Amino acid sequence: GIELELAIELICDSVKSINDIEEVSIEKARGRIIGEDIIATINQPPFDRSPLDGYALRSEDITGASKKNPIKLKVIDEVCAGGYTHKEVGKNETIRIMTGAKIPKGCDCVIRQESTDYGMETVEIYQEVKHHQNYCFEGEDITKGSKLINLGEKLSYIHIGIIASMGYEKVKVIR
């Protein structure tokens, strides 16, 4: 057998000190043990956004819409993924919107394009959509200031992606 004191000494020698930290680029951090808590620096998504391709609109304008009773709206703009518009949607207006685009002012929902005639200047809506339906809120996935990764976790590809999405270029890891 081995004496208790010697066993403790061997264990202590083999354990890396949490104080023995180095900073490395995130590209070299996979598989390493994180030496600090990783905190969200921004909200994700960073703004209210559309989860699908369709038309951003006011739900009150399409109450009662159906295939037999389509409601026609004026298309006033188009917003691509990651884009935005300064236009505000008014009564009986809509903006064509792609997945990931910022929800325009005045809109409280998005209708999927498959529930429309895909119109460019005017669009026929074939279905009701409720308030905040198909609507992703700012910070819905990650809230600024929340802890994303705990000190002592082994970093995987997933962790590295999260760290990168927060704008970190380097992280502290245990040597």
Language-model segments: what does each one mean?
Residues 1-69:
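Short, low-complexity N-terminal leaders and the immediately following helix N-cap/first helix
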